[in-house]
Amino acid sequence: MPALARRNYRYELTAAFFLPFLLAVVDSAIIGVVVKNAYEGVVEDTLLNFVVAVITASAAFSNIVSFAWVRLSHRRDKVPFINGLQIAMIVLVGLIGFMPRSGAGMWALAACVLLARFCWAGFITIRSTIWRQNYSRPVRARVTGKLATVQVLTLALLGLGLGASMDADPQWFRVLLPGGCVISLVGVWAWSRIRLRGRASLLQQEAASSENGDAPSFNPAGMVRLLARDRLFAGYMACMFLLGLGNLMQTPLLVVLLRDEFKMEYMGGIQVTSSIPLAMMPVSIPLWARLLDRVHVIQFRRIHSWVFVIAAGITTLAMYSHTSALLWAAAVVQGLAFGGGALAWNLGHLDFAPAHRASEYMGVHVTLTGVRGLIAPFLSVGLYEALAERIDNASTWAFGACFATCGLGAIGFQVLARHKVRLDAASARPAETAPPTRVE
């Protein structure tokens, strides 16, 4: 690894430890459990379930504005732009700690969570350009895997600490949040020290794309044009949509059912939905990173997607049998899948994107994540609420729908991987040339 890359890596490693003190508060599973428990009895149950569903899916659907972040950061220094987003997020998370336990407080808390997640989505989108510039393809997955390991372990421990504190006294929330915001400033400082390799060249390429009329736009039609031009990437996005939709449908539904059917409080809910999956990610990240460094992301997803299908199947069985042990098992398998998902989600688009369009490809990717995140909570919780009025085992059928959707995505990756093999074989075949014309 070049000296500049090693220097950047050290600062990113520092940030990966300290920024979770900020992120833990708006981690979708953690904040969903907090809201479900804290506002139970304050508002009507069905309304609370839908608010929890939206908050729990906020990490995904906040990405719907990513194309706007790509446009706003175009032709601008990326690191200072990211620092601005981090500071805005600190302010919003700090406000969450002062929300009253009332209907109005619930809505204000939800608004702060959504705005904070919008800021984090911008950070993730722009960070992909920095990773592409700073880390070469052969080491990129391993480097980002190590960063992800530090982040998720810190998040897992913070989630457990928050759950234990709030089971003891819910008012700890008002002390821990401002404290976490202060600690996270170290992560903001660390990011401010990162240097972008090829910064001048990248800005020149972005300026040239603006002059050629090929710059990112606020108009979502630009996303459609990109997908039309890159059909293989469009196929990848279609399969990701199905797999991701099935996954995103599960978390809001699980948060609701852990409380309503399994009677878990803060600690139990956070363990199943967040801490256990996060703690398992470092186990699988090194293995997934080695695979992703060797193969195209389509071939990677062809294997990896089935782990998500298995996890969804175990959760469905847990609901059918009302067995808590299966919930823990599903959380373990889900965490193993998340390890690979964290790598491929952040890096997969780089197997398709030219250097100066990395943020644009990432913008398309995360915007579509936002679209499915907007659909998923209403689809799963809405299906459960509708079935609960008619049948006894509504939770089983609702999770069965999640399982089937994940399965369709995994099958799609099998088809796409075979198509990619055919394309590679065709491009490797020597082109036929016409025989020379004899001169009479």
Language model features with spans:
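Multi-pass alpha-helical transporter architecture, strongest
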Residues: 2, 97-100, 183-196, 400-433
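Helix-loop boundary and gating motifs at the non-cytosolic
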Residues: 1-64, 232-275
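Intracellular juxtamembrane helix-capping segments at the cytosolic ends
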Residues: 122-135, 340-354
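A membrane-interface helix-boundary motif in multi-pass transporters
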Residues: 164-182, 384-406
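Juxtamembrane intracellular "pre-TM" segments in multi-pass secondary transporters
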Residues: 1-9, 198-238, 430-440
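Helix-to-loop junctions at the C-terminal end of transmembrane segments
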Residues: 64-78, 166, 283-297, 384
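Cytoplasmic membrane-interface "Motif A"-like loop-to-helix N-cap segments
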Residues: 74-87, 293-308
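C-terminal ends and interior cores of transmembrane alpha-helices
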Residues: 87-104, 307-322
